[in-house]
From Swiss-Prot:
Predominant location: nucleus
N6-acetyllysine: residues bearing it: 283
Residues recorded as bearing Phosphothreonine in the entry: 345, 360
Organism: Mus musculus (Mouse)
Region (Interaction with CUX1 and HDAC1), start-end ranges: 160-350
Sites annotated Required for TP53 activation: 347
Positions in coiled-coil regions: 65-98
Official protein name in the record: Protein BANP
Processing after translation: MAPK1/MAPK3-mediated phosphorylation at Thr-345 and Thr-360 results in export to the cytoplasm.
Subunit text: Part of a corepressor complex containing BANP, HDAC1, SIN3A, SIN3B, RBL1 and RBL2. Forms a trimeric complex in the nucleus consisting of BANP, HDAC6 and KHDRBS1/SAM68; HDAC6 keeps KHDRBS1 in a deacetylated state which inhibits the inclusion of CD44 alternate exons. The complex is disrupted by MAPK1/MAPK3-mediated phosphorylation of BANP which results in BANP export to the cytoplasm. This facilitates acetylation of KHDRBS1 and CD44 variant exon inclusion. Interacts with TP53. Interacts with CUX1/CDP. Interacts with HDAC1.
Gene transcribed to yield this protein: Banp
Function: Controls V(D)J recombination during T-cell development by repressing T-cell receptor (TCR) beta enhancer function. Binds to scaffold/matrix attachment region beta (S/MARbeta), an ATC-rich DNA sequence located upstream of the TCR beta enhancer. Represses cyclin D1 transcription by recruiting HDAC1 to its promoter, thereby diminishing H3K9ac, H3S10ph and H4K8ac levels. Promotes TP53 activation, which causes cell cycle arrest and inhibits tumor growth. Plays a role in the regulation of alternative splicing.
Length: 548
């Protein structure tokens, strides 16, 4: 084996052979002769004229330059993207005035979300663009993640908000001084019914997926109120809520979410909520909640509470959750009655719901005006029942047996009771969309001054005509908000089956839209004071009358 010193000598000799004119001493070469002076280290300068090396170096240089150019191009693209995001962020935060782009994200931001046993419906992402340069139009752009993009001139104008997907666009036009309705006389609320049918023939000359809706005006609901800022024609929607109810909502709803859900109950019946959602999509074939009304709720919350977009995102999820809850309750046959209120008077009513609730007769002229729209409804077959009355002292008194007459109101209509000058009670119903009713029972007896509550079971499916109550100890409960009339008379001859009017002296109990009452004593006193012709043989429990 060669030693380390021998190896160093061999390397030194090899280097000297390569450059005989310029002897080179390696850095680690050690001179053994102490008398010989050490050689100075020389810098080796190689002048190589080999063209292959030059070509190789040139290719390396070109590769590095191309890589740098690619990095520079990516940086420029990133800078352009940042600028675009900055501009969109400025639009969202209202830093620019034309146009103002406000995102209204509803439901899951990624569309459909799936768990182990549940599949939520696809909730659209909604963007509202207020463009003052296009006749003060409000453009509500609804993104459908399940569809492909379709070319459209209007879509191309407003497609910068969420690129790469098809947008179902709803153009909401603010009515001018002489343009409170559409050309065909259709009101804003009626025009909004075509929103769920985007792409249908109602949107000609606009696009296959664009529908023009005119914001309604005060003439649509003269007795109603504004949702949103009534002084801003772009941020308000007229609704059928009467001023007293709106004042009640504003007073009792301390949070934006509570107000949104309360407004939802006032504006959409629970039956409508059960078969609808925000997107109008899903495996159950649900319909879409009126976007104009939802936009009104949004305007109202922004105006009253100054909520942020994240708050509105959460509220939209709560609205969808409320609709799913109503759907599940309907599938189980449970009550859809609203516990917080029971008055649902149509906007065309000529008198208030409080007068209707207690049977107070309206003025004769108003009654005559409402009669052409009212259809008399005959009572069903009589059935003997026992009526229990709870006195002021809390004692339960059994009224002698009488006849109970039950009339189910057809779906989509509302019951009203009026009293003529001769004291006859007329039972009729007035149409109102999206309502249905049922009579439920609780097999729980009355005990003391309270009534035990249980989940009611439906006695017959919706759509039946009459119901015969079985004799026994079944507790019959007309749920709060139920538009079903049950009249009990002590006179068996006063059947009223043929539609003949029942005398007030024969009526012991009547059911009509009842306000929530928790004090039975006050309820009985109020009923006796306002209706002296009717015996206060009733018990009010959470807005319902319990009889046996």
């Amino acid at each position: 084996m060669m030693s380390e010193q021998d190896l160093a000598d061999v390397v030194q000799i090899a280097v000297e052979d390569l450059s005989p004119d310029h002897p080179v001493v390696l850095e680690n070469h050690v001179v053994t002769d102490d008398d010989e002076p050490a050689l100075k280290r020389q810098r080796l300068e190689i002048n190589c004229q080999d063209p292959s090396i030059k070509s190789f170096l040139y290719s390396i240089n070109q590769t590095i330059c191309l890589r740098l150019d690619s990095i520079e191009a990516k940086l420029q693209a990133l800078e352009a993207t940042c600028k675009s995001l900055e501009e969109k962020l400025d639009l969202v935060t209202n830093k620019q005035h034309s146009p103002i782009q406000v995102p209204m994200v509803a439901g899951s931001p990624l569309g459909a979300t799936q768990t182990c046993n549940k599949v939520r419906c696809v909730v659209p992402q909604t963007t509202v663009i207020l463009n003052n340069d296009r006749q003060n139009a409000i453009v509500a752009k609804m993104e459908d993640p399940l569809s492909n993009r379709a070319p459209d001139s209007l879509e191309n104008i407003i497609s910068n908000a969420v690129p790469g997907r098809r947008q179902n666009t709803i153009v909401v036009k603010v009515p001018g001084q002489d343009d409170s309705h559409n050309e065909d006389g259709e009101s804003g609320s009626e025009a909004s019914d075509s929103v769920s049918n985007c792409g249908q023939p109602g949107s000609q000359n606009i696009g296959s997926n664009v529908t023009l809706i005119t914001l309604n005006s005060e003439e649509d609901y003269p007795n109603g109120t504004w949702l949103g800022d009534e002084n801003n024609p772009e941020m308000r929607v007229r609704c059928a809520i009467i001023p007293s109810d709106m004042l009640h909502i504003s007073t009792n709803c301390r949070t934006a979410e509570k107000m949104a859900l309360t407004l939802l109950d006032y504006l959409f019946h629970r039956e409508v909520q059960a078969v609808s959602n925000l997107s109008g999509q899903g495996k159950h074939g649900k319909k879409q909640l009126d976007p104009l009304t939802i936009y009104g709720i949004r305007c109202h919350l922004f105006y009253k509470f100054g909520i942020t977009e994240s708050d509105w995102y959460r509220i939209k999820q709560s609205i969808d959750s409320k609709c799913r809850t109503a759907w599940r309750r309907k599938q189980r046959g449970q009550s859809l009655a609203v516990k917080s209120f029971s008055r649902r008077t149509p906007s065309s009513s000529s008198y208030s719901a409080s007068e209707t609730m207690m049977g107070t007769p309206p003025p004769t002229s108003e009654l005559q005006q409402s009669q052409p729209q009212a259809l008399h409804y005959a009572l069903a077959n009589a059935q003997q029942v026992q009526i229990h009355q709870i006195g002021e002292d809390g004692q339960v008194q059994v009224i002698p047996q009488g006849h109970l007459h039950i009339a189910q109101v057809p779906q989509g209509e509302q019951v009203q009771i009026t009293q003529d000058s001769e004291g006859n009670l007329q039972i009729h119903h007035v149409g109102q969309d999206g309502q249905s009713w049922g009579l439920c029972q609780n097999p729980i007896p009355v005990s003391g001054d309270s009534v035990a509550q249980a989940n009611p079971s439906q006695l017959w499916p919706l759509g039946g005509d009459t119901l015969d109550l079985p004799a026994g100890n079944e507790m019959i409960q007309v749920l709060q908000g139920a538009q079903l009339i049950a009249v009990a008379s002590s006179d068996p001859a006063a059947t009223g089956v043929d539609g003949s009017p029942l005398q007030g002296s024969d009526i012991q109990v009547q059911y009509v839209q009842l306000a929530p009452v928790s004090d039975h004593t006050a309820a009985a006193q109020t009923a006796e004071a306002l209706q002296p012709t009717l015996q206060p043989d009733m018990q009010l429990e959470h807005g319902a009358i319990q009889i046996q």
